[in-house]
Amino acid sequence: MQWETVIGLEIHAQLATQSKIFSGSPTAFGAAPNTQASLVDLAMPGTLPVLNEEAVRMACLFGLAIDARIDRQNVFARKNYFYPDLPKGYQTSQMDHPIVGKGHLDITLEDGTTRRIGITRAHLEEDAGKSLHEDFQGMSGIDLNRAGTPLLEIVSEPDIRSAKEAVAYVKAIHALVRYLGICDGNMAEGSLRCDCNVSVRPKGQAEFGTRAEIKNVNSFRFIEKAINHEIQRQIELIEDGGKVVQETRLYDPNKDETRSMRGKEEANDYRYFPCPDLLPVIIEPEYLAKLREQLPELPVQKRERFESQYGLSAYDASVLSASREMADYFEKVQEICGDAKLAANWVMVELGSLLNKDGLEIEQSPVSAEQLGGMILRIKDNTISGKIAKMVFEAMANGEGSADQIIEAKGLKQVTDSGAIEKMLDEVLTANAEQVEQYRAADEAKRGKMFGFFVGQAMKASKGKANPQQVNELLKKKLEA
């Protein structure tokens, strides 16, 4: 039997506000436990929440970016459940009247095709605290620094059909919230977390299968692995005569498996009701019109512009527009050197390799856009060859200065004097007289391979400084003379 996978994702994006959603407590990551929790966060009697206007602004920006309906009136609700790190015994969230309604996001897949994923809603809510188990013997500690941190929960339609599509969608959301400046997207710190709802059904069946939810997956790689494992688990279970149970599961990356955590709750299990401490939020059209003017160029728009303005391939444009910082870096390099394709190649290949090796983000690059753009200029004006440029790039990464300073200090300037190159080539050909005779006696196919030998000897003799184009042209003339 052929099976079809149905996936819906719930992404929790921690909003980049300076204070919590209902109190003035700071939201900085990594503070000592319970040093960023106020009386409101601790749910002390008599305290009342005050809504953070910046969180509302950020949610509205997101709604505008996904072309969603933004309700004029939205209401906060209490989601009731007990957990040790939830001081109030309920979470303030939104249920029937979320701030952001139906929208969509277009994603680009590995084969270059585009798919539109529907977004059901996005609502504001507060985060819970954190239970600490490993530092205590026979008990657990509670850190309430995170309690009350503003979250935007983004709920997709069940439009995703594979683990790879799921990763592409999460990457698109990740890029979007960073472009908007509403979330730093740091998955290692929990700023962006994903719950994956997975079910399978016989291909062609309209009715959905029973879904399982995989909670709090916090990396692109783990999202793909967790979903693929869950798909396989459900198919094997059904084919063996069993039934999929609606439940919440956890992904264990060490064992590459999902395991049952608890039965999956429905909305009525949480006994939602409007929060009596918070008035409905009214969002006027004039407010949204002003916000729309603040929208930056979004990832899809930037990618399309990179293709049309700079003539980049769809793949290159996609990589370079993946983050706002990467796009800004590339455009600065391009502005300096005036060659978009050379700039794209150096940013994606050499710089990308350096950043990956050292585990750095583009904003932490040891080579500035000004330095890289200046170096590419020296390739274009034939001051250095592409091969020497790699040496210059490495020196810049080691903090040895600008391209011009390094070229001067190390004597790396390319030899472009035809007379000097001809003299050097004569010496190379004299030293390899036997190979010269073999070349002249060979057919065209063999000559192509042998020519590379002479080029290599010439570049070796010049220590890589001879202009490669001149070497090729002059060498060909001499060998065919």
From Swiss-Prot:
Reactions mediated catalytically: L-glutamyl-tRNA(Gln) + L-glutamine + ATP + H2O = L-glutaminyl-tRNA(Gln) + L-glutamate + ADP + phosphate + H(+); L-aspartyl-tRNA(Asn) + L-glutamine + ATP + H2O = L-asparaginyl-tRNA(Asn) + L-glutamate + ADP + phosphate + 2 H(+)
Alphabetized InterPro entries for the sequence: Asn/Gln-tRNA_amidoTrfase_suB/E (IPR017959), Asn/Gln-tRNA_Trfase_suB/E_cat (IPR006075), Asn/Gln_amidotransferase (IPR018027), Asn/Gln_tRNA_amidoTrase-B-like (IPR003789), GatB (IPR004413), GatB_C_1 (IPR042114), GatB_Yqey_C_2 (IPR023168), Gln-tRNA_amidoTrfase_suB_CS (IPR017958)
GO molecular function: asparaginyl-tRNA synthase (glutamine-hydrolyzing) activity; ATP binding; glutaminyl-tRNA synthase (glutamine-hydrolyzing) activity
EC nos: 6.3.5.-
Highest taxon, organism lineage: Bacteria
Alphabetical GO biological process terms: glutaminyl-tRNAGln biosynthesis via transamidation; translation
Keywords linked to the UniProt accession: ATP-binding, Ligase, Nucleotide-binding, Protein biosynthesis
Entry's family note: Belongs to the GatB/GatE family. GatB subfamily.
Primary role: Allows the formation of correctly charged Asn-tRNA(Asn) or Gln-tRNA(Gln) through the transamidation of misacylated Asp-tRNA(Asn) or Glu-tRNA(Gln) in organisms which lack either or both of asparaginyl-tRNA or glutaminyl-tRNA synthetases. The reaction takes place in the presence of glutamine and ATP through an activated phospho-Asp-tRNA(Asn) or phospho-Glu-tRNA(Gln).
Subunit structure: Heterotrimer of A, B and C subunits.
Protein known as: Aspartyl/glutamyl-tRNA(Asn/Gln) amidotransferase subunit B
Organism: Pseudomonas paraeruginosa (strain DSM 24068 / PA7) (Pseudomonas aeruginosa (strain PA7))
Gene: gatB
